[in-house]
């Protein structure tokens, strides 16, 4: 996982332009780009056809989770615990990511009958003193790990 674009504040238009340039420069297909449908990314899908919108409150793939965001967060935790993810970033980004990962906690840990969920973003903000933007990004990236992109069947020679 690379953090290729990192800005403190961006307008919707600058995000669109930066994403287009990044996809061209790094040859990232639109099908491998995910944006937060609840944030500034909510309008991007209409301008960048084919990108994935992340709706964290949507129904999870696996019904043992509260919602899609929780399922992705648990997948992130699994990959981290199994040392199966690497993030290429600056030292400052690393420090912030470590801080934000510290607030990735399971909610309702005592309840045996409840679905698995994570503490709310508001609780995370209260603990951190800022929005967990890097954590959100990492959680959204797990969409591709829990929901693989369907592979198109390859056409055989002579067939259309």
What is each PLM-predicted segment?
Residues 1-114, 155-160:
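Mg2+-dependent endonuclease catalytic cores in nucleic-acid-processing enzymes, primarily RNase H-like
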Residues 5-9, 106-160:
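Acidic two-metal-ion nuclease catalytic site recognized across multiple nuclease folds
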């Amino acid at each position: 996982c690379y953090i290729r674009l990192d800005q403190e504040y961006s307008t919707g238009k600058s995000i669109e332009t930066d994403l287009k340039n990044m996809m061209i420069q790094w040859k990232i297909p639109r099908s491998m780009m995910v944006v937060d449908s609840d944030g500034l990314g909510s309008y991007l899908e209409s301008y960048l056809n084919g990108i994935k919108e992340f709706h964290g409150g949507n129904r999870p793939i696996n019904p043992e989770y509260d919602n899609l965001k929780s399922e992705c967060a648990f997948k992130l935790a699994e990959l981290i615990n199994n040392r199966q993810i690497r993030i290429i970033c600056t030292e400052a980004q690393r420090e912030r990511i470590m801080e934000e990962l510290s607030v990735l906690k399971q909610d309702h840990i005592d309840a045996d009958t409840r679905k698995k969920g994570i503490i709310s973003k508001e609780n995370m903000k209260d603990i951190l003193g800022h929005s967990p933007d890097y954590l959100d990004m990492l959680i959204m990236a797990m969409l591709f790990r829990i929901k693989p992109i369907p592979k198109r069947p390859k056409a055989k020679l002579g067939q259309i």
